[in-house]
């Protein structure tokens, strides 16, 4: 939803900028228009939820640790309860392209790693393999995909 400047003005609260209040009919129209940003956002969120539901490392009781990936990337590592699946959840929180050295993640080299979101594989070969992030891109790097 775009910034709701009228709501900020009416309430006097800056946080109201992202607190748009929908009526049911307008929301239904927006979500049923497949070309609307609202329908696209909902579709993308549903796809991410479907991916998460299939991955044991996203179980609520799975192990989780935050990672130090520098100032541009927020990350955390999750491991399934049976320890078979690891997922590195990495988020570029900037509006610029950024890179993370795969060596900094301590990936197990004998596993095949792929991004659950894009479906692309990650090549661990080379002298200094890197992950490249587009602005605000998320990568869920997993050793076992289901």
Predicted ranges, named:
Residues 94-96, 107-111, 131-135:
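Short, low-complexity, polar/charged sequence segments that are solvent-exposed and flexible
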Residues 48, 113, 136:
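A residue-level signal for conserved active-site and pocket-lining positions in enzyme catalytic cores
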Residues 1-107:
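Loop/helix patches that line or flank the sugar-binding groove of alpha-linked glycan CAZymes
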Residues 65-67, 121-124:
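Short, exposed beta-strand/loop patches in secreted or surface proteins that constitute
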Residues 88-91, 115, 141-142:
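Conserved active-site loop/cleft motifs that coordinate metal ions or position small ligands
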Residues 124-146:
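C-terminal beta-strand-rich structural cap/linker in extracellular carbohydrate-active enzymes
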Residues 104-119:
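Solvent-exposed beta-hairpin/edge-strand motifs
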């Amino acid at each position: 939803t775009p910034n709701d400047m009228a709501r900020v003005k009416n309430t006097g609260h800056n946080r109201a900028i992202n607190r748009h209040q929908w009526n049911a009919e307008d929301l239904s129209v927006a979500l049923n228009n497949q070309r609307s940003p609202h329908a696209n956002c909902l579709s993308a969120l549903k796809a991410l939820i479907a991916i998460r539901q299939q991955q044991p490392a996203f179980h609520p009781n799975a192990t989780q640790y935050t990672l130090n990936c520098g100032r541009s990337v927020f990350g955390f590592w999750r491991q399934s309860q049976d320890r078979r699946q690891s997922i590195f959840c990495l988020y570029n929180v900037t509006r610029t392209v950024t890179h993370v050295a795969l060596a900094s993640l301590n990936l197990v080299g004998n596993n095949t790693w792929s991004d659950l979101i894009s479906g692309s594989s990650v090549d661990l070969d080379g002298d200094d393999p890197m992950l490249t992030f587009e602005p605000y891109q998320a990568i869920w790097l997993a050793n076992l995909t289901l």
